[in-house]
Amino acid sequence: MDSQGKKVVVCDNGTGFVKCGYAGSNFPEHIFPALVGRPVIRSTAKVGNIEIKDLMVGDEASELRSMLEVNYPMENGIVRNWDDMKHLWDYTFGPEKLNIDTRDCKILLTEPPMNPTKNREKIVEVMFETYQFSGVYVAIQAVLTLYAQGLLTGVVVDSGDGVTHICPVYEGFSLPHLTRRLDIAGRDITRYLIKLLLLRGYAFNHSADFETVRMMKEKLCYVGYNIEQEQKLALETTVLVESYTLPDGRVIKVGGERFEAPEALFQPHLINVEGVGVAELLFNTIQAADIDTRAEFYKHIVLSGGSTMYPGLPSRLERELKQLYLERVLKGDVEKLSKFKIRIEDPPRRKHMVFLGGAVLADIMKDKDNFWMTRQEYQEKGTRVLEKLGVTVR
């Protein structure tokens, strides 16, 4: 709470999950899937202890997903369906989750870098007009990650469910001209895994199976350090084969797909996306930075978001960066490579890094009124109030 007794809420609305809680806390109060479901057949049945309603949100929708038509209101970090997004916020602030009176609260929201201004304007409009928060602040996700890690300078590789971005931050300021965005993230890898499993003869085609495969991905997938070697293992042995039990009791066997799916992050052409993979994008970003800052950036690469949680990802990233540096900067001179210092930080709680940074920032700002956009300012200026965040509103 701030000095006037107003609660300060932090809400990290991801494409795949909502993480929400309060300023100063060191873990989100609630984490739930950002999905909205509607029953396929109209019925007033109960499944277990959950009643089927016309509109199901979050955890409940996830549990009963086989009976629902499931929608995600956000795609690639941008809100696509505002009505469903409002249902999601109603659920977040309502009795099921935070249970707050939004009129007496301030809220800190997050968004990916390079997001359309229209998206941010609409979010602020909904927060003030529908929920009537007393203050609103919108922070860039990558900067919050660094705050959570206690750094002011570094490069954040943030890969969530909807978008991956590489965002250099110098002395606490994100550098938009160097920020790169890659629209391959967790959701695309889940989709690719579904495709790979289909080739093996397992069909997952209902919107609800998507959640099932996502859970399987989180349990079994990893990033291969040396792809040729992994492929050899997959073809010639059964070391990689794991059994997985589906919710309906069927058991399926998953082998090479375990590393083939996340490989799309490093080789986008596998899922028909043009452009370079995450390692080369990171290398290009740092090399495009000012020559005096590059060494600092190589020493402070911070991973964040659920799609960086694959075992083997940090070491693969380091290997590819060294390889690229050797080829393109040192022109193949191996002796100089020992002087090249690189450090990839993979904090264990990186899945919720953005929320943690938001909780730190909101706690520092809670009584500094000049940081927040207030309801009064919004009533006077409308969406022009965003200029307070240092954003030019056209």
Swiss-Prot record:
ATP binds at G160, D161, G162, R214, M215, M216, K217, E218, G305, G306, S307, T308, M309, Y310. CDD domains: ASKHA_NBD_Arp2. Pfam families: Actin (PF00022). Transmembrane segments: none annotated. GO terms for biological process: Arp2/3 complex-mediated actin nucleation; positive regulation of double-strand break repair via homologous recombination; positive regulation of transcription by RNA polymerase II. One of its GO terms (molecular function) is actin binding. ATP-binding component of the Arp2/3 complex, a multiprotein complex that mediates actin polymerization upon stimulation by nucleation-promoting factor (NPF). The Arp2/3 complex mediates the formation of branched actin networks in the cytoplasm, providing the force for cell motility. Seems to contact the pointed end of the daughter actin filament. In addition to its role in the cytoplasmic cytoskeleton, the Arp2/3 complex also promotes actin polymerization in the nucleus, thereby regulating gene transcription and repair of damaged DNA. Belongs to the actin family. ARP2 subfamily. Component of the Arp2/3 complex composed of actr2/arp2, actr3/arp3, arpc1 (arpc1a or arpc1b), arpc2, arpc3, arpc4 and arpc5. This is Actin-related protein 2-B. The gene is actr2-b.
